[in-house]
Amino acid sequence: MSTNLLESTPPFTQLRTGVLQKYTPGLLLCSIAVLIAMIVNHFFSGVSPLIVAIILGIILTNLIQLPASTSPGITLASKKLLRLGIVFLGLQLVFSDILSLGFPMLAVIVCIVAGGIFGTILMGHLLRMKPTQVLLIACGFSICGAAAVAGVEGVTDSEEEEVVTAVALVVIFGTLMIPFIPFATKVLGLSPEIGGMWAGGSIHEIAQVVAAGGVIGGGALGVAVVVKLARVLLLAPIAAILSFRQRRQGYTSPDGKRPPVVPLFILGFLAMVVLRSTVALPDEVIAAGGFLQTALLSAAMFGLGCGVKIQNLIHVGVKPFILAFGSTTLVTSIALAGTLLTHLG
């Protein structure tokens, strides 16, 4: 009877049931982690849910052996949901806000990203590290943290361990920058505006920039976020350039497909930027987009955190940490020098 019932089930229904059974356990675990991260953020607003989520993933995967049934859903979150989160990230950007920074500061931001990437690649070459690992760290530290790592990973042949290492380093060094930039701003006697621009130009994750800008105070938060979002906008051309380079080199993915000239999620990101900049969206829509972006990226961060085995991180050696320190120092220095030059006199 059961065999006849199964045979009589429409193929689409069978497929849908199979997909649900495959991904539900992992996605349910990610959802619980996102809920916990959101609750922590509600009571401690200075703590990013993205950081909480990745820490939860790291702790959980190193304390217990996760059931194999959760693996497909966790992998889906760390890849597909992350890219969808990047699409909704575009709703945070408004061209007019970025243009209000003025040409000199926009030129500085381009120098921060370009100088950070090329300088980090040079340091990685001197350290004789694998080029794909170097590129992930360079873009993550120079553009927008884990989202940039994911964006670059989507157009290169990076290994999973390299992605996880780059994200872990972004979390570690970006978190250390939260108290450092406000402290250095005070020691150097910088104004809140300059301190905010410095924070936005040097710190890796948007959430980390928000935390540092809030500590600096005096209006630093607003300008810090705008500068940071200007860096985020450069993810699109960088990803497109890297994808084009991969096509020129004849790279194909494991399924035999060549990378697109411009990744689909980058086109979605740009579409959201254009939508936000040209259409007067209701506050409710913007808020919903922000919530979706945070939830999706938090789920992705939890998924990436579940791939961080402390033992494996120890085995990668000291070179990635040296490169991360060098990249952070370089980006921070360019951001400070450029910001000061644009505000002389």
UniProtKB/Swiss-Prot annotation:
Location within or outside the cell: Cell membrane
GO CC term, one of those recorded: plasma membrane
Membrane topology reported for the UniProt record: Multi-pass membrane protein
Pfam families, sorted: Cons_hypoth698
Main location: membrane
Bilayer-spanning residue ranges: 15-37, 44-66, 81-103, 105-124, 134-156, 163-185, 205-227, 261-280, 285-307, 320-342
Signal peptide limits: none
UniProt entry keywords in alphabetical sequence: Cell membrane, Membrane, Transmembrane, Transmembrane helix
Family: Belongs to the UPF0324 family.
PANTHER family xref list: INNER MEMBRANE PROTEIN YEIH-RELATED, UPF0324 INNER MEMBRANE PROTEIN YEIH
Full protein name: UPF0324 membrane protein Cgl0015/cg0018
